[in-house]
């Protein structure tokens, strides 16, 4: 795979890893970095996730292969989360991840206090849709901001032009297509009683849907999707 350089900095291929086995596979096959979640404070409650011992082993393995490891702590925290988060960050300090991925300002504040020497990346969960937001997080001490999935390539280019060269932009290339906005999805809570903002998303954005017209109960009109958009009645109506 050829290298792509921006102002002397190579673009980074970042891969999610749901287990120690997946982490090692991603590293062996050439990932520049992987991101992982612990048993709390991340948004992948259904994944196996990592114990602290597994994190330590994974970080040591990755570093031995010149690969970075980022740890997610990107829940939208409630009051009862904060003391546990502080203790968790103290434990993470002992195993040395390369960065934390955070969305909540309260969690950000605790992380800066407990891990002042570790980079912080601002999660897509924080709704990062404009260059002023990026500038704000840079002033707070964030190293990288993850673009909202709603952004076009042109919008990302405009952001790049308005932020310091040293600041990093991360962009998703595939995966869930969150709405309302970029991760702060209410569909899972509404439809399945499982809160996406607490790591229990059922991914209703990936389900297949039909439309029912009010006066025709029981008559289901399928919804189609292709690279050009989403359709009902195929060529008749474009959503």
Residue ranges and their predicted role:
Residues 46-56, 103-115, 150-164:
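Active-site-adjacent beta->alpha loops and helix N-cap segments on the catalytic face
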Residues 26, 104, 137, 171:
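Conserved, mostly hydrophobic/aromatic
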Residues 145-151, 162-235:
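Flexible C-terminal active-site loop/helix
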Residues 6-33:
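N-terminal basic/disordered segments at the start of proteins
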Residues 4, 67-136:
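N-terminal active-site wall of soluble small-molecule enzyme domains
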Residues 237-239:
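Conserved small/polar residues in nucleotide/adenosyl-binding loops
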